[in-house]
Each structure stands twice: as C-alpha cells, then as structure tokens.
C-alpha cells in the first residue's frame, strides 16, 4: 500500500513548490471571474480561492471541508456553479471522463473550470515510467493533454487557455529546488510543452444561449451544511 498520500505529498518540499507555481497561474483567473458560487476540489492546505471576488466559496474533500461529497456526484444543482477548480483531481479518478460530465452539469453557461494535471511528456512522466515507487504521485495516471482536449468537446466544454509549468526535475531537496528555479523561465521559452504539469482554463459552452444575463440560482446545496468558518447555510429547492 502507498506510504504517502496526496495530502502528505503536497506538504513536501516538491509538493509545495508545485502548488506555489500553480497558485501563481490560477490566481489571476480566479480574480477575473465573477458570479455567485465558486468551488475548490482536492485535499490541499492552500486556498486557491482566497483572492476570489465571488461571495460564496466552498471546498470539497479538503482538510477543512465546507461540504463533504464524492467527486463522482457533486451536490449542486444543474447550471449553478460559476467557477470550479479541480487541481490534480482527474488523474486520481477511476473514470475521469465521467467527472468531466458531472462538472459540465453543474457549471453555469460560460462558467469556468480550472484544471491542473501531471504531464506525462516531461521529466516527471519519465520518472513515473521508470519508477517502482508506489507512493503519490507516481502511482496515479498521468493523463495526456491530448486526451483532455479530446474529451472536452464531447462533454460540451472548451479550452480557452493553457500553459505548462514546473520544468525542474522531481527532486525533494528544497535547497536544490531553489538553485534550479531558473529552469522555469528557460523551460517556458525553449521547451514549453515539457513542463511537469499543465494548467487549463475551460468554459462551458451552450450553443444558442445568451450568457450575458444568465438566470442565477439563488440556492445551491441539497442539504443544510454547517461550516466552522461561516454561519450561513444553503439549501436547494426541492
């Protein structure tokens, strides 16, 4: 059995290095997204929604969850979520395509989905192929960018922005990570498709709909939920 869980790995020097890079990519999109409801999925100490201007923000399956749910069935009404962040979620799923379909269901028309995932065509992907390590992330599926791009139009989603990051080799020595950090600029210029992770901004497209003035749903959650950080509860209409 794996000795290191995803939660533990993302607290390691390499995991923190990766999350810091991803935060820098994700934050500008978060700050530029408006609406009523924003969701972050995943077990991370980092809050990707901390700079969001959206009032109602929730985390799923995190160390301090606002909502407890299975990733396969999101507890939200159809077309009710404006922004959903799913960092390194698809690669942990048995059926990642089904999760994309579920995300499409809950997103508003023109709603945004942010995905990050490990790139198999990278130094990280090479280590995964050559490693017998049973710990995260080397025991997960590295889904290729081409496969993601193949799935998106099938489920009604469209990629509007994409970028690679983390060109350093996957080492855990913090001192070495600081020394070779310059590889990020070099990689972005000379081998941009070989980063350790990809960052994608995706939108839900609904043909024939005018998304300028969508009909916002006032209520979101199917059952009342208590949050230690909030005193408000929300309930879906029956």
Sequence positions of predicted segments:
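C-terminal lobe and adjacent flexible extensions of AdoMet/dcAdoMet transferase-like proteins
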Residues: 182-238
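Short alpha-helix
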Residues: 139-162
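A short acidic, Gly/Pro-enriched loop at the edge of an enzyme's catalytic core
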Residues: 72-84
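A short SAM/SAH-binding and catalytic strip from SAM-dependent methyltransferases
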Residues: 82-97
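Conserved catalytic loop of SAM-dependent methyltransferase domains
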Residues: 159-184, 193-194
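Conserved class I S-adenosyl-L-methionine
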Residues: 112-142
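Class I SAM-dependent methyltransferase SAM/SAH-binding core
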Residues: 24, 28-74
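A short glycine-rich, Lys/Arg-flanked "PGG" loop and its adjoining helix->strand segment in the class I
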Residues: 97-112
């Amino acid at each position: 059995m794996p000795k290191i869980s995803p939660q533990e790995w993302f607290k390691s020097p390499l995991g923190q290095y990766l999350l810091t890079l991803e935060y820098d990519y994700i934050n500008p999109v978060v700050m530029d997204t408006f609406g009523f409801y924003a969701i972050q999925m995943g077990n991370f100490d980092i809050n990707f929604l901390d700079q969001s201007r959206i009032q109602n923000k929730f985390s799923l399956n995190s160390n301090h969850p606002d909502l407890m749910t299975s990733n396969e069935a999101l507890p939200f009404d159809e077309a009710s979520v404006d922004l959903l962040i799913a960092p390194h979620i698809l690669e942990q799923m048995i059926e990642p395509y089904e999760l994309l379909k579920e995300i499409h269901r809950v997103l508003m028309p023109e709603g945004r989905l942010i995905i990050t995932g490990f790139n198999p065509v990278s130094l990280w992907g090479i280590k995964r192929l050559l490693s017998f390590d049973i710990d995260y992330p080397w025991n997960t599926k590295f889904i290729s960018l081409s496969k993601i791009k193949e799935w998106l139009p099938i489920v009604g989603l469209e990629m509007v922005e994409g970028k690679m990051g983390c060109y350093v080799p996957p080492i855990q020595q913090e001192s070495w990570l600081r020394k070779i950090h310059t590889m990020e600029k070099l990689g972005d210029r000379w081998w941009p498709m070989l980063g350790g992770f990809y960052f994608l901004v995706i939108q839900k497209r609904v043909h024939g709909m005018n998304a300028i003035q969508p009909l916002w749903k006032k209520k979101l959650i199917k059952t009342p939920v208590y949050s230690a950080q909030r005193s408000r509860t929300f309930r879906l209409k029956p």
